[in-house]
Amino acid sequence: MAHPKRRISRSRRDKRRAQYNAKTKAPAVATCPVTGQSHHSHRAYWFEGSLYFKGRVVMTKEK
């Protein structure tokens, strides 16, 4: 039976798998019900000087 000559490290294996996954999956984009802004899912985003997360203002930028 064929078998590998050298053991493949976890990092090398995961790098190979990451290339395949990056090509096949599109980033998850959500639309905020409050602002109507499109953004990445499960991420906070800035809109008109305020930081939003899950439809709520988390932080406001001071001028």
From Swiss-Prot:
A GO molecular-function annotation: structural constituent of ribosome
Keywords noted in UniProt: Ribonucleoprotein, Ribosomal protein
Compositionally biased tracts (Basic residues): 1-18
InterPro entries named among the record's database cross-references: Ribosomal_bL32 (IPR002677), Ribosomal_bL32_bact (IPR044957), Ribosomal_zn-bd (IPR011332)
A UniProt-annotated Pfam family: Ribosomal_L32p
Region Disordered: start-end pairs: 1-27
A single cellular component GO annotation: large ribosomal subunit
GO biological process, one term: translation
Keyword Ribosomal protein: yes
Domain of life: Bacteria
Family, per entry: Belongs to the bacterial ribosomal protein bL32 family.
Stored PANTHER family: 50S RIBOSOMAL PROTEIN L32, LARGE RIBOSOMAL SUBUNIT PROTEIN BL32
Alphabetized NCBIfam families for the sequence: rpmF_bact
The protein's name: Large ribosomal subunit protein bL32
Gene that this sequence comes from: rpmF
